[in-house]
């Protein structure tokens, strides 16, 4: 058996199945396309789900891929063992109602024995215990020795996820030899030992499982196979773990070189090296597919991986930023299969560098805080960190909860995850609407997928808003029906339509569908299963039936307004790249008739001056009256023309290219104007951050700009009246009022400072001594926080040595401030711990540094009791 590298194995696999009539698809993005049910692509078939369910028509009934995948379900084991990984590639061949078991098994055997040259006597196979067809194909048609065939039960050899498509599977194993086995003389696949390594699963999707657990035969049977590239690399290179496989080993060696730590000499260091090696692969591919670090969703997965790798670099003694440097090696070993990595190299490095730098700024302080929590837990004989403290580490210092758990586990401690999650939910409630469920895969079918034949709705609306068509399908109450009547809410499918379906960030068209017996108000238009276009609306009068001839009329005003905003997004995109840099990519958009929203990848706020330049550029192009042209061409020609593609989007062989003179060229399927002058005018309304590394611009065009300027003019007139100023003198009048306010504020601050010093003199004599430490406590009412902190500082300075604990009651709330001199810190005093315990008495919480801390509470009746408790806390700290 000849050794093969990962890149060669991948190439051979795709070449083999191409020779068998398969369409070779490039790996899909790790970000699912139009699938909110899945966070990240985690299997070879995941991006093909709509082909299996019939929602979309595949480019061929035979396909093969080598698909990038991410799984983080067992991330805590990555690095701890040499088997687990978060990033991997899954090679697979697929049939959508074409070939079935015979061809799948036959070609699998041919590839393994003739293309990979794996010795036949090293191969074992398993089949589902009730699948006689597969068994006979292996035994009788392939002449495979029955002594190396094993029948296994449902848990091992039957694939299903709840209800829906499912079926038996046949797995191919490699016999690694007796030295990997157990003492069982009957050892074979199905045993838990390491001898038999499963490397290729062939799933025969032939059944449909209902909610009662009954199985019925599918009309169109499918094939879904999966072969882990890295696992096959272990077999072909004769190594035990993926970290010894050529391309991954190369990255591991780069980690060794950067850290100066040798792999294989220290088990603890080996864990860190494996974690960094695995995670930098995942991070590189995630960023290349447009994922950015954030605190939720797939962005959180990226942040978690990146920060975990960064921490383990520190454990290996790395002090500077280093993850960026490892990206070079990841790209080097993957550049042939994934040229996009080369194209996005500088962008990937920038994203990773910024995130690592952010984490470096807080990790030392966060680690110090966590270590102090750990010390308190051990001193008090406790083993569980509170959820509130874990959340503070997450919210203030950027510690993902998983990282906190990992550090605690190293000390044989744990965290109250339930309480942490409660704190997280509170924050989400405060900061944003709860986001939808993104866990797991949904197999809910579009009713249109039940149609016996494909409905190819043809869109004729790029240049026309009027048209004619025939009703091909009617959906009412999520069921296909033959007819519908006045008042019914329906979705109808036409063979031809001028209604644009929602897509590319642009909302769907609205309007009317009519004939002599019908008026249907279309409220929205969307893409449906089987290449259909769904017209969603209400029957205002009459009735409809399948086969009826109808006329389509798109609302001209809303179509034109949406086209203005869509064309403007192209001009905006180009202007943003000119002003901010080529790293800018579209990260999302929303085009409605009322306004446009455009998200971009950029790593800092866009200044007002930059926004002015961007806005001016767009308006200059509008005034230049450039022709807008839309052409269909192959993807290669489009790229040669310099067309900008949507980051991470999957395109077919033919694409639609929208050109605006020589200024902007983009791939786009939306509706557009014919000349830039039709935009009228462009105005940016706002700019802000929506996630780490993502900025959002909202803007308006055309008549909306006129209405906006008219409203602003009215506001300015009203301000002039209220300030008794003329418009040309308004700025000067406002500046004068601000200066007056500034002087009054300074007078107020000086007065409060004077009162604070007077308070110090009257309070100082109340000091007491606790275990050799001077302590001053006092309660104020109606004082602002700045003055309270200033008073505490003045008391501490006058005290010279000791602790100051102050409380301030405002309305029904109380604030605590604790400060301590440097010398008492050496005696064990910790202001953060004091304020936390004191605040608890009054129903509050807080914390901070050893020398300074503050807290808030709600029970004002317990303030005196809380202040008195400060002396008890000090007694426990000073031994």
Swiss-Prot record:
Q: What is the lineage of its organism?
A: Bacteria, Bacillati, Bacillota, Clostridia, Peptostreptococcales
Subcellular location, record wording: Cytoplasm
How and how many cofactors are bound, per the record note? Binds 1 zinc ion per subunit.
Q: Which reaction does it catalyse?
A: tRNA(Ala) + L-alanine + ATP = L-alanyl-tRNA(Ala) + AMP + diphosphate
Tell me the function of this protein: Catalyzes the attachment of alanine to tRNA(Ala) in a two-step reaction: alanine is first activated by ATP to form Ala-AMP and then transferred to the acceptor end of tRNA(Ala). Also edits incorrectly charged Ser-tRNA(Ala) and Gly-tRNA(Ala) via its editing domain.
Q: Which InterPro entries match?
A: aa-tRNA-synth_II/BPL/LPL, Ala-tRNA-lgiase_IIc, Ala-tRNA-ligase_IIc_anticod-bd, Ala-tRNA-synth_IIc_core, Ala-tRNA-synth_IIc_N, Ala-tRNA_ligase, Ala_tRNA_ligase_euk/bac, DHHA1_dom
Pfam families with a match to the protein in the record: DHHA1, tRNA-synt_2c, tRNA_SAD
How is this protein named in the record? Alanine--tRNA ligase
Q: Which domain of life is it from?
A: Bacteria
- Family as reported in the entry's similarity comment: Belongs to the class-II aminoacyl-tRNA synthetase family.
* Keywords of this entry: Aminoacyl-tRNA synthetase, ATP-binding, Cytoplasm, Ligase, Metal-binding, Nucleotide-binding, Protein biosynthesis, RNA-binding, tRNA-binding, Zinc
- Which cofactors does the annotated protein need, by name? Zn(2+)
The EC code for this enzyme is: 6.1.1.7
| Gene3D superfamilies referenced in this protein's UniProt entry, alphabetically | 2.40.30.130, 3.10.310.40, 3.30.54.20, 6.10.250.550, Bira Bifunctional Protein, Domain 2, Threonyl-trna Synthetase, Chain A, domain 2
Provide the binding site for Zn(2+).
566, 570, 668, 672
GO molecular function, a single term: alanine-tRNA ligase activity
Listed under GO cellular component are: cytosol
Gene name linked to the record = alaS
Major localisation: cytoplasm
**Keyword Signal tagged:** no
Q: Name one GO biological process term.
A: alanyl-tRNA aminoacylation
In the record, which residues are listed under signal peptide? none
Annotated stretches, region: Disordered:
426-449
Task: Print the domain comment field.
Answer: Consists of three domains; the N-terminal catalytic domain, the editing domain and the C-terminal C-Ala domain. The editing domain removes incorrectly charged amino acids, while the C-Ala domain, along with tRNA(Ala), serves as a bridge to cooperatively bring together the editing and aminoacylation centers thus stimulating deacylation of misacylated tRNAs.
């Amino acid at each position: 058996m000849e050794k093969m590298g990962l890149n060669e194995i991948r190439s051979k696999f795709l070449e083999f199945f191409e020779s068998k009539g398969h369409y070779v698809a490039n790996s899909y993005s790790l970000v699912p396309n139009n699938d909110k049910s899945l966070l990240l692509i985690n299997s070879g078939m995941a991006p093909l789900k709509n082909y299996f369910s019939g929602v979309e028509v595949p480019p061929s009934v035979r396909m093969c891929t080598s698909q990038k995948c991410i799984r983080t379900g067992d991330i805590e084991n990555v690095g701890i063992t040499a088997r687990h990984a978060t990033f991997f590639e899954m090679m697979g061949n697929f049939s959508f109602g074409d070939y079935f078991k015979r061809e799948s098994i036959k070609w699998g055997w041919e590839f393994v024995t003739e293309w990979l040259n794996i010795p036949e006597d090293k191969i074992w196979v398993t089949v589902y215990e009730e699948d006689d067809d597969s068994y006979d194909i292996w035994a009788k048609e392939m002449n495979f020795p029955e002594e190396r065939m094993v029948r296994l039960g449902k848990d091992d050899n039957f694939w299903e996820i709840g209800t829906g498509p499912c079926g038996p599977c046949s797995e191919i194993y490699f016999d690694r030899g007796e030295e990997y086995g157990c003492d069982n003389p009957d050892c074979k696949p199905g045993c838990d030992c390491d001898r038999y390594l499963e490397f290729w699963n062939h799933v025969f999707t032939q059944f449909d499982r209902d909610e009662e657990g009954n199985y019925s035969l599918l009309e169109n049977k499918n094939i879904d196979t999966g072969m882990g590239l890295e696992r096959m690399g272990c077999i072909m290179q004769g190594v035990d773990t993926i970290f010894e496989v050529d391309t991954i080993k190369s990255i591991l060696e780069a980690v060794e070189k950067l850290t100066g730590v040798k792999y294989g000499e220290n088990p603890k260091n080996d864990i860190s090296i494996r974690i960094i090696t695995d995670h930098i692969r995942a991070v590189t591919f995630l960023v290349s597919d447009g994922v950015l670090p954030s605190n939720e969703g797939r962005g959180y997965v990226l942040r978690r991986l990146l920060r975990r790798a960064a921490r383990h670099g520190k454990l290996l003694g790395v002090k500077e930023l280093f993850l960026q440097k490892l990206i070079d090696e990841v790209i080097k070993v993957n550049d042939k299969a994934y040229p996009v990595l080369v194209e996005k190299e500088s962008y990937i490095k920038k994203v990773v560098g910024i995130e690592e730098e952010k984490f470096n700024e807080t990790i030392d302080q966060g680690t110090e805080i966590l270590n102090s929590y750990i010390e308190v837990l051990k001193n008090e004989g406790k083993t569980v960190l509170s959820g509130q403290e874990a959340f503070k580490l997450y919210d203030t210092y950027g510690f993902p909860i998983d990282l906190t758990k990992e550090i605690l586990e190293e000390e044989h401690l744990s965290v109250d995850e339930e309480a942490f999650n409660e704190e997280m939910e509170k924050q989400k409630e405060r900061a944003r609407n709860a986001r939808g469920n993104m866990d797991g895969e949904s197999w809910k079918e579009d009713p249109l997928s039940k149609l016996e034949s494909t409905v190819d709705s043809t869109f004729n609306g790029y240049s026309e808003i009027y048209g004619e068509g025939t009703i091909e399908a009617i959906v009412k109450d999520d069921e296909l029906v033959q007819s519908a009547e006045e008042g019914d809410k329906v979705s109808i499918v036409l063979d031809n339509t001028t209604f644009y379906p929602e897509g590319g960030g642009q909302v769907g068209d609205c309007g009317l569908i009519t004939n002599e017996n019908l008026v249907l108000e279309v409220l929205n238009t969307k893409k449906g299963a089987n290449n259909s276009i769904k017209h969603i609306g209400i029957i205002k009068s009459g009735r409809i039936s399948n086969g009826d001839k109808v006329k389509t009329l798109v609302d001209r005003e809303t179509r034109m307004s949406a086209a203005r905003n869509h064309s403007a997004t192209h001009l905006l995109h180009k202007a943003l790249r000119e002003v901010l840099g080529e790293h800018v990519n579209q990260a999302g958009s929303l085009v409605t008739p009322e306004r446009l929203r455009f998200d971009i990848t950029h790593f800092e706020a866009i200044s007002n001056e930059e926004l002015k330049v961007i806005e001016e550029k767009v308006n200059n192009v509008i005034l230049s009256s450039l022709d807008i042209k839309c052409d269909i061409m192959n993807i290669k020609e489009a790229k040669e023309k310099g067309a900008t593609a949507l980051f991470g989007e999957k395109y077919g062989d033919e694409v639609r290219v929208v050109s605006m003179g020589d200024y902007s060229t983009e791939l786009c399927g939306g509706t557009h104007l014919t000349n830039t002058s039709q935009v009228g005018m462009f105005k940016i309304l706002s700019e802000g951050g929506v996630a780490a590394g993502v900025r959002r611009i909202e803007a308006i065009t055309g008549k909306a700009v006129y209405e906006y300027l008219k409203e602003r003019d009215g506001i300015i007139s009203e301000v002039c009246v209220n300030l008794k100023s003329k418009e040309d003198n308004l700025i000067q009048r406002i500046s004068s009022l601000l200066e007056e306010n500034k002087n009054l504020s300074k007078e107020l601050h000086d007065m409060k400072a004077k009162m604070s010093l007077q308070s110090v003199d009257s309070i100082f004599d109340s000091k007491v001594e606790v275990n050799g430490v001077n302590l001053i406590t006092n309660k104020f009412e109606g004082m602002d926080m700045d003055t309270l902190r200033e008073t505490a500082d003045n008391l501490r300075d006058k005290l010279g040595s000791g602790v100051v604990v102050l409380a301030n009651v405002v309305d029904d709330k109380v604030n605590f401030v604790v400060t301590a001199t440097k010398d008492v810190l050496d005696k064990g005093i910790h202001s953060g711990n004091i304020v936390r315990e004191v605040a608890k008495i009054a129903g509050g919480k807080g914390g901070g540094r050893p020398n300074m801390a503050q807290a808030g509470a709600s029970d004002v009746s317990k303030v005196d009791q809380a202040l008195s408790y400060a002396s008890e806390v000090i007694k426990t700290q000073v031994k």
